[in-house]
Design a protein with these regions (language model features):
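N-terminal export/assembly segments and adjacent metallocofactor-ligating motifs
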Residues: 1-222, 229, 240, 249-253, ...
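N-terminal leader/propeptide and maturation segments of large enzyme subunits in energy/redox metabolism
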Residues: 50, 56, 215, 222-246, ...
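Flexible glycine/proline-enriched surface loops and loop-helix/loop-strand junctions
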Residues: 149-150, 193-195, 237-239, 269-272, ...
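A short, gly/pro- and small-residue-rich
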Residues: 156-177, 286, 353-367, 404-406
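Phosphate/diphosphate-binding loops
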Residues: 356-358, 362-375, 413-425, 429, ...
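Flexible glycine/proline-rich, aromatic-decorated loop/lid segments
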Residues: 375-410
């Protein structure tokens, strides 16, 4: 971090950190625009009535008294906390606070993590390989062929900085030994664009294709599949049925199976698109099983390592919630079971309209938001107690996925708080002191710094980088290094099972919407710049072009040229994208890199609040989504059908790409002869 005269100027990764090695993604680089954003709240505010956007400045003492009174007056179990993926350090305070009140655990649901399939993937690893659920890190650098089923790891999946480095190592070999990448997904992402083969698979068919590949390997005795103890896992697979369901011919499936088995260190990765369907649990397991069939699990050449257990319970964070947990909270709120709701996130924007969070929020008597800007959910709050930005805050986070070793990342202020904001950790510690009793006993620290010192003291006696018995030296070392991690690689490997379950099957996926009325499958995807929409208030991210379309500052819908011609659509036409639950307007982008039966829309735009750079730009594709769930209760975000309605008007999409020559080439393609 470059700081001059008390002002932050430039952010970079920590060169000592085992995951990023000094590199940073676009969203990390743009963090300065969170700190210096002109639309940040300067102090605590009260809104009366909710939804009017008439905010009255409030002294922090008055605000904390109001909240403490509300907590004390709440019915038993009627205090609730909703958040996205909050820092582990905040979870370590919120968890004991709620427990002291005999309130249910926090509901922590992150839409980007859901689109990445984190929980489904972790649960599948635990289910197949005989351990606890643990998020894997796939060793691309040591692989010689990678079959990626919808894992867009060069853009947004899990840790694109770490995976980008690993992919560079995969491609860094001598000519002919540069690794081989096959990308299975219905839309060509940046990862598919750099792959050796892109397989435009039908949405929801990833699991049956993985099963078919395994079946071919077993039947032909390819590679380590010959006499494998895991062969029975694939016994029920139907190669012809998989070809029909996926749109990938049986001949190509055979070619792919032989290619996968023909390498020494093959790796199969189940990415977000596999986990976005009602068959998520079955399909993710099917892809993972290819690694076991290839003999690439559990030894020094394992295709993946696992997130290790935390060094101490203090660093474990809170359990991540499923979409089913969110639905249960919504029902509690709607039924009057929540007197006070704390919100650390933006569920009114992040959740599908069909989830009906707006109506449930209106039923909550008192709502407290911790947003540093007025977002859609904060507009419906009684109090906004703005948190510091991360550049003004203390905290810690266990890296997940961890790479080749456990890493406890540190967070410390690089500048003094610019405004009269307050760390959310300090707010809960203050409330605990005011409430006395069990809350004070559970959270005895007067402020966040003392809490952090106590947490870091648990590292005393651990191995390098600062092996010492002195807590003060550990605290100093943690701040100097920027966290804690071993100096040498120590991956946690999965256990190789004796045999995977026999006769595994992947059922037919369900889709929301009747095919005749809604003929296209919707493929929402995470924006490389805006993420799930949290980056929309940062103009550097707004103007960052999408790597495949070069679009920015608006919302577009990607449509195959054949589909566009059939609908009479041209580039920059405005259409209505309609699902059974809602509708949005979007600009047409004619894109050959997508299946004709699929339309794709990026996440991130469509805010009605969140400041001048985010509000009233584009549309929010999350509004269209179904509330169907897959295994483990996760949202089946890729299971929505839509229709396209031309609106008879045009709006030019801001983009770097020019159509000069492109449209001419398309016309040439159509010409006879």
């Amino acid at each position: 971090m470059r700081v001059s005269n008390g002002r932050a100027h430039k952010i970079e990764g920590n060169p000592e950190h085992p995951l990023n090695r000094g590199k940073l993604c676009a969203r990390g680089q743009a963090g300065l625009q969170l700190l210096y954003n002109p639309d940040r709240l300067r102090n605590a505010v009260r809104q009366t009535p909710r939804g009017t956007r008439k905010f009255e400045p409030l002294h922090w003492e008055d605000a904390l008294v109001q909240v403490a009174d509300r907590v004390a007056a709440a019915k038993p179990g009627a205090v609730a906390f909703y958040g996205n993926l909050i820092p582990d350090s905040l979870a370590a305070i919120v968890g004991p606070f709620l427990a002291a009140l005999n309130a249910p655990p926090a509901v922590l649901y992150d839409p980007q993590a859901a689109l990445e399939g984190r929980q489904t993937l972790a649960q599948a690893v635990g289910r197949l390989f005989g351990g606890k659920a643990a998020l894997p890190f796939f060793d691309l650098a040591a692989s010689d062929v990678v079959f990626s089923f919808g894992a867009n790891f060069t853009e947004t999946w899990l840790s694109p900085v770490a995976y980008g480095r690993a992919f560079g190592a995969l491609r860094g070999g001598a000519l002919g030994k540069r690794g081989y990448l096959v990308q299975f997904e219905p839309r060509m992402s940046a990862t598919a664009a750099v792959a050796d083969e892109w397989v435009p698979i039908a949405p929801g068919a990833e699991g049956v294709v993985a099963m078919a590949l395994g079946k071919i390997m077993v039947d032909e005795g390819l590679g380590r599949a010959r006499n494998s103890p895991h062969a029975a896992f694939f016994a029920a697979a139907d190669v012809a049925g998989a070809a029909a369901a996926s749109g990938v011919s049986a001949e190509r499936l055979t070619h792919l199976a032989r290619a996968f088995a023909g390498f020494d260190r093959p790796t199969a990765i189940p990415g977000g698109t596999v986990a976005g369907h009602t068959t998520a649990a079955e399909a993710v397991a099917a892809v993972l099983a290819l690694n076991a069939l290839a003999g690439h699990v559990g030894d020094a050449e394992s295709a993946f390592s696992l997130t290790p257990p935390p060094l101490d319970a203090a660093f474990a964070g809170a359990a991540v919630s499923s979409f089913t947990d969110v639905q249960a909270l919504i029902e509690r709120m709607r039924d009057g079971g929540v007197d006070l709701l704390f919100v650390y996130g933006n569920p009114l924007y992040e959740l599908p309209v069909a989830a009906a969070f707006a109506g449930a929020l209106a039923a909550a008597p008192f709502v407290v938001s911790f947003s540093s800007q007025v977002d859609e959910t904060a507009v419906q709050a009684d109090l906004i107690l703005p948190d510091h930005t991360y550049l003004e805050s203390w905290g810690y986070q266990l890296a997940s996925p961890p790479g080749d070793r456990s890493a406890l990342s540190g967070q410390q202020p690089v500048v003094s708080p610019l405004y009269d904001t307050r760390a959310t950790t300090d707010v809960f510690l203050d409330l605990a002191q005011r409430l006395d009793g069990a809350a004070r006993q559970a959270l005895p620290w007067p402020n966040t710094v003392e809490f952090m010192k106590a947490a870091m003291a648990r590292l005393v006696g651990q191995d390098a980088p600062y092996a010492t018995k002195n807590a003060d030296k550990v605290w100093a070392g943690w701040r100097q290094l920027g966290g804690w991690w071993p100096t040498t690689a120590a991956p946690t490997l999965p256990a190789a099972p004796a045999a995977l379950p026999a006769g595994w099957t992947v059922s037919r996926p369900q889709f929301d919407g009747e095919g005749g009325a809604y003929p296209y499958l919707l493929h929402p995807y995470i924006s490389v710049a805006l993420g799930d929409g949290r980056g929309a208030s940062q103009p550097w991210l707004q103007e960052t072009p999408d790597p495949m379309t070069t679009g920015s500052w608006d919302t577009w819908v990607e449509i195959h040229p054949e589909t566009a011609a059939r609908l009479g659509l041209k580039q920059d036409d405005v259409v209505k994208v309609v699902s059974p639950h809602s509708e949005i307007d979007a600009i047409v982008y004619i894109y050959p890199g997508i299946r004709p039966d699929v339309v794709a829309v990026p996440l991130g735009q469509g805010h009605s609040a969140l400041g001048r750079y985010a509000a009233n730009k584009g549309a929010n594709v999350m509004a269209l989504l179904t509330t169907l769930t897959g295994g483990g209760g996760e949202l089946a975000w890729a299971a929505t059908r839509v229709k396209i309605e031309p609106l008879g008007r045009r709006r030019v999409l801001p983009r770097i790409e020019s159509n000069i020559g492109v449209d001419f080439a398309r016309e040439e393609d159509k010409a006879p002869g």
